[in-house]
């Protein structure tokens, strides 16, 4: 009885130090490629939603992404004739035809880059931006200019990633889980979300909010402090909290209120841009 791709990848992971493009067995290559194709098509995901803020990480899928770098040599890659790249991972759109783009139903504005093994949902828009391997970008989401979606990050439906936003990846430094931005979130310009932080549905981050696992997320109404998670429907701005000794303040993300009609009017997506 043949092994499943998951069991092959789990075994290969334990022996990863000995893998190389020259020595990798065919079954490992086949299993890794099957995962990358599934990620590319959106049929396999690094993490799956169980409830609001509750996600199950498929660690074996993340391992397959990491193993793929052990199985390929760098090689020249064309870029429309204006330059070349030298890498292990080809563009998602390397062999796309007009029919493929039409079937995908998304827009890709030059010079946006998405690597093979990432998924882009229907009616999504990629302005000049970067989507890394393993990432998932949901339907109707806007990835604005110079925004980056890190490896294996999970971006929900109808999300707006504003200009210069950085969504962290899992590859280096290796993270236990991906950054997750749930449906209908708005991430303000130049904000950074890293280290597997979860932004729950309908949340709004203002411009310049930085959140990692050690960042205090302070709710000014309740006094509660969260780590690694922004509760659903929160409106978050950059701020600071005083130290215990009162001699200095440290950066914190401050929940100032819950999303209301006024907030939604300011952050609504423009359907005209999704056609």
Curated annotation (Swiss-Prot):
Pathway: Amino-acid biosynthesis; L-lysine biosynthesis via DAP pathway; LL-2,6-diaminopimelate from (S)-tetrahydrodipicolinate (succinylase route): step 1/3. Its EC number is 2.3.1.117. CDD domains: LbH_THP_succinylT (cd03350). The gene is dapD. Belongs to the transferase hexapeptide repeat family. Gene3D superfamilies: Hexapeptide repeat proteins (2.160.10.10), Tetrahydrodipicolinate-N-succinyltransferase, N-terminal domain (1.10.166.10). The keyword Lipid biosynthesis does not apply. Its main location: cytoplasm. GO terms for biological process: diaminopimelate biosynthetic process; lysine biosynthetic process via diaminopimelate. This is 2,3,4,5-tetrahydropyridine-2,6-dicarboxylate N-succinyltransferase. It is found in: Cytoplasm. Substrate binds at residues 107, 144. One of its GO terms (molecular function) is nucleotidyltransferase activity. Homotrimer. It comes from the Bacteria. Pfam families: Hexapep_2, THDPS_N_2. It catalyses: (S)-2,3,4,5-tetrahydrodipicolinate + succinyl-CoA + H2O = (S)-2-succinylamino-6-oxoheptanedioate + CoA. GO terms for cellular component: cytoplasm.
